[in-house]
Amino acid sequence: MSQVKYKRIILKVSGEALAGEKGTGINPEVIKHLAEEIKSVHDMGVEIGIVCGGGNMWRGETGANLGMERAQADYMGMLATIMNGLALQDGLENLGVPTRVQTSIEMRQIAEPYIRRKAVRHLEKGRVVIFGGGTGNPYFSTDTTAALRAAEINADVILMAKNGVDGVYSADPKVDPNAKKYSELTQLDLISKNLKVMDSTASSLSMDNNIPLVVFNVNKPGNIKKVVMGENIGTVIKGDK
C-alpha cells in the first residue's frame, strides 16, 4: 500500500462506458475488461466503492422530455443503474473478487439495502461495494450519488471513468482541434469555465466536502491502477475551492 496514493476510492462508471462501441445495452466484453481492471487495483489492497450510471439503458431526463412524469422517468433510470451494477458484480465475482451490491431502493431478493456503516464494514473487509439505484430520489444524477457516497464513506477521491475521454478540455477536442487539455482544475473552475464534468449539485457536494476528482479514460488498460498510484494521466479536480 506504500505506493498507493488513494486508499479508498469511489469509481464512477458511466452507463455509456459499459455499452462500449454499441452505445446502448451491456457489452459483456466491456464488463470483463472493467472487472479485470478493478481486480488489479483490489489486489493492491485499495478499498473500492463503485457507482454505475444508467445512460446505456435509460435517462430520466430524456423520458421527461418525451412527456413522461419526471419522477417516474427517474425511477426507471435508477433501475437501469441496478441492472448495470448486477452485471458488474457478476464480472467481478467471476474473477474471485468478493462484491456486494447495495441499493438505495430496497429489493432484498437481489441486493442489500444501502446502509452506510455496513458499506464501510464491507470495504474494511476487502469487499468491493457497488452502489445501485442512485440516491433513491428523483431529480438527482448518479454523479451526485458518487459525490454523496464518497462523502459518506470518507473516500479519498472520486475517479470519473470516462468512455474514450482522457481528461477535461476547454472545448470538445473532436470538434475543436485547438481544445486545451487541463491537467489540474478546481471545482470553482468547472463552474466559471462552464466545463460539463458533472452537474452543479455533484460539484458543490464534492467541493463542500473537499473531495478531489480525477477524470480519465477507462478504456485504456492499466489506467485505473495508474490513477490510484498517483500518475498524472487525466485531469485532477481539486476538492477545495
UniProtKB/Swiss-Prot annotation:
<feature type="binding site">
    <location>
        <position position="172"/>
    </location>
    <ligand>
        <name>ATP</name>
    </ligand>
</feature>
<dbReference type="GO" id="GO:0006225">
    <property type="term" value="P:UDP biosynthetic process"/>
</dbReference>
<keyword id="KW-0067">ATP-binding</keyword>
<dbReference type="GO" id="GO:0033862">
    <property type="term" value="F:UMP kinase activity"/>
</dbReference>
<dbReference type="InterPro" id="IPR011817">
    <property type="entry name" value="Uridylate_kinase"/>
</dbReference>
<dbReference type="InterPro" id="IPR036393">
    <property type="entry name" value="AceGlu_kinase-like_sf"/>
</dbReference>
<dbReference type="Pfam" id="PF00696">
    <property type="entry name" value="AA_kinase"/>
</dbReference>
<feature type="binding site">
    <location>
        <position position="59"/>
    </location>
    <ligand>
        <name>ATP</name>
    </ligand>
</feature>
<keyword id="KW-0547">Nucleotide-binding</keyword>
<comment type="pathway">
    <text>Pyrimidine metabolism; CTP biosynthesis via de novo pathway; UDP from UMP (UMPK route): step 1/1.</text>
</comment>
<feature type="binding site">
    <location>
        <position position="55"/>
    </location>
    <ligand>
        <name>ATP</name>
    </ligand>
</feature>
<keyword id="KW-0665">Pyrimidine biosynthesis</keyword>
<dbReference type="InterPro" id="IPR001048">
    <property type="entry name" value="Asp/Glu/Uridylate_kinase"/>
</dbReference>
<comment type="similarity">
    <text>Belongs to the UMP kinase family.</text>
</comment>
<feature type="binding site">
    <location>
        <position position="54"/>
    </location>
    <ligand>
        <name>UMP</name>
    </ligand>
</feature>
<protein>
    <recommendedName>
        <fullName>Uridylate kinase</fullName>
        <ecNumber>2.7.4.22</ecNumber>
    </recommendedName>
</protein>
<keyword id="KW-0808">Transferase</keyword>
<feature type="region of interest" description="Involved in allosteric activation by GTP">
    <location>
        <begin position="20"/>
        <end position="25"/>
    </location>
</feature>
<dbReference type="GO" id="GO:0044210">
    <property type="term" value="P:'de novo' CTP biosynthetic process"/>
</dbReference>
<feature type="binding site">
    <location>
        <position position="163"/>
    </location>
    <ligand>
        <name>ATP</name>
    </ligand>
</feature>
<feature type="binding site">
    <location>
        <begin position="12"/>
        <end position="15"/>
    </location>
    <ligand>
        <name>ATP</name>
    </ligand>
</feature>
<feature type="binding site">
    <location>
        <position position="74"/>
    </location>
    <ligand>
        <name>UMP</name>
    </ligand>
</feature>
<keyword id="KW-0021">Allosteric enzyme</keyword>
<feature type="binding site">
    <location>
        <position position="169"/>
    </location>
    <ligand>
        <name>ATP</name>
    </ligand>
</feature>
<dbReference type="GO" id="GO:0005737">
    <property type="term" value="C:cytoplasm"/>
</dbReference>
<comment type="subunit">
    <text>Homohexamer.</text>
</comment>
<comment type="function">
    <text>Catalyzes the reversible phosphorylation of UMP to UDP.</text>
</comment>
<feature type="binding site">
    <location>
        <begin position="135"/>
        <end position="142"/>
    </location>
    <ligand>
        <name>UMP</name>
    </ligand>
</feature>
<dbReference type="GO" id="GO:0005524">
    <property type="term" value="F:ATP binding"/>
</dbReference>
<keyword id="KW-0963">Cytoplasm</keyword>
<keyword id="KW-0418">Kinase</keyword>
<dbReference type="InterPro" id="IPR015963">
    <property type="entry name" value="Uridylate_kinase_bac"/>
</dbReference>
